[in-house]
Amino acid sequence: MPIKRFFNPSEPGRPQRAAEMLRFALVGTAAVLIQYAIYALLVCAIDHNLAMSVGYGVSFVFNFLASTRFTFRVERTMKRGAGFALSHTVNWLLQLAVLNLFLRLGLSKTLAPLPMFAICVPVNFVMVRFFLKQNGVRIFALFQLRREEFAPVALFSGLLLLLHALLIARYWTLFTPLRAEYGTIFIRHFHLSGFDPITYSVISEWSAGYNVYRHPLLAFLVYPLSLLNQGLMQLTGINCAVFLTAALLLFCALYSFVFLHRLLRDVLSLRLADARLLSAFFFSLAYVLLSAIAPDHFLLSLFLLLLTLYLSGLYLRQRAPLPTVTTLLLFILTAGVSLNNGLKVFLAALFTRGRGFFRPHFLLLAVLLPAALLWQFSRFEYRQFVWAGEVARHEARAKQKAVRQRQLPTLQRQSPPPKTAPKMGMPMMQGEFMRWTDMSTPRLSSTVENLFGESFQLHRDHLLEDLFGTRPVIVPYRCVVNYVVEALLVLLFLAGVVCGRYNRLLQLALSFALLDWALHLGLGFGLNEVYIMTVHWAYVVPLALACLFMRLRGGSLRLLRVLVLLLTIWLYGWNLSALVSYLLPA
């Protein structure tokens, strides 16, 4: 319900809503006083985050009882309780973030909660009312497994648990001991292709460790796991970051599987057996499977992109526009994890809304305003959390370089550096983002060996080596069979695109993929290791194959099923054997 309806005199039910707001103000004031009193008592003895969390927990219990019985006067149910807990979890995270922000800006621990409450309490009112009065509990239906999903999800869970166990065992002795500093250990010793273990570092000891311009909200989204890890460290005596990261990735992987399966079933109306086959096929692709265990941001992006596609597909099927609030929330989450993927949410809104996308109120509230605010937040985050550390690191490096230069003999200092094969392409121009472009890396060989090669089938030579280590930019396959499989996959994909060229869902997914291909192959962003971005676009392959399944009949369809099944078996066999051999100790 729009907020303006609360204040419209001609709106029916206005007195009831006014009374509701008054009751909320009374209950909210009492809850705030309880929380602040407990915080003020504890903050002198324990960490301010823990003190605020204890106070919030006590006020939460009071708030739930008072909100259901007095404020909104609704029946207490399990679903409403879950929705209430979810809204308060979001509000708790927001409170911690705002509290630490004002502390960093110079306010005392006594005064910082006051502006925090001023910001967070109105947000909490909107969320609580949504879950208790507007049937917002329906959102949980998205995460409720259906009977037909139990078996494939259980099998997929078993596979992922095994792979996570192998990865954790590989780094157990290095990553679980408690240390004074964690980042260096993770960066120096973790090796899994080009994936970065930044999530391990941020959960072990929170910082804005990700690139704040490309991942502006990601560090804050994993902040609760960092707090939980601090408590587990005290209880267990080990760093549990590897387990918490695995749990997060497992959740995202399972629901990515579920959302893809539902896209095939609910939106494309595929048969159950075909939907299961194509869902399994998707996760047989090398860097989709690898992203499911890599402690990086890619699987979170896949989860959010498939959620965006699923919701958009449902609205396309109903010929309804993607709501403004839904667009706003999807953009904040998706762009907050990876900024360029936020453009895909706007594409989804454009496909579902058509010309309505350009209406001033939608363009302002759902596109321009959130994009501007997120960009400004990125710049603020850089100034507050990153800039001072970067200056200190640059100064330290300059001092070390000066010391080394003084120690080197004159002739050695004047000799040219040894020649090495260049791995970073020549940028189109210098700048905050354009310095990441690449106009010199060959496009054709990158497409064959990396974009549709390594992304789908791991190379045995230089297996899972890092480009910034010993891996060349271009690695050929040893066996012609790999090129045959790659050609089959590309041909089937193109055939599916032709068959589904009028399908709105496939058109939307293709627009997502084309955006990535334009960035990688056109501008050269990340072209030298384009395979690690596979999950940002590879879902278009099973969706195109689904359109091919829908077009064929009789013997042709049976032949296609057998071919896709054989390709899936080959990909799992090829990629899992390589991955397991890499993870097992030598």
Where in the sequence are the language-model features?
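Transmembrane-helix signature of polytopic, membrane-embedded enzymes
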Residues: 50, 111-112, 260-284, 507, ...
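Perimembrane helix-loop-helix junctions
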Residues: 142-143, 342-371, 385-399
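Transmembrane signal-anchor helices characteristic of membrane glycosylation enzymes that use polyprenol
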Residues: 146-194, 201-206, 368-383, 568-574
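Lumenal/periplasmic acceptor-binding loop at the mouth of the active site in multi-pass
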Residues: 197-243, 413-495, 506-509
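Transmembrane-helix motifs of polytopic, lipid-linked glycan transferases
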Residues: 247-268, 491-495
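Short acidic/glycine- and proline-prone juxtamembrane loop motifs at membrane-interface regions
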Residues: 293-297
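Specific aromatic-rich, kink-prone transmembrane helix
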Residues: 300-317, 544
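Membrane-interface alpha helices of multi-pass inner-membrane proteins
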Residues: 322-339, 345-353, 365-370, 566-567
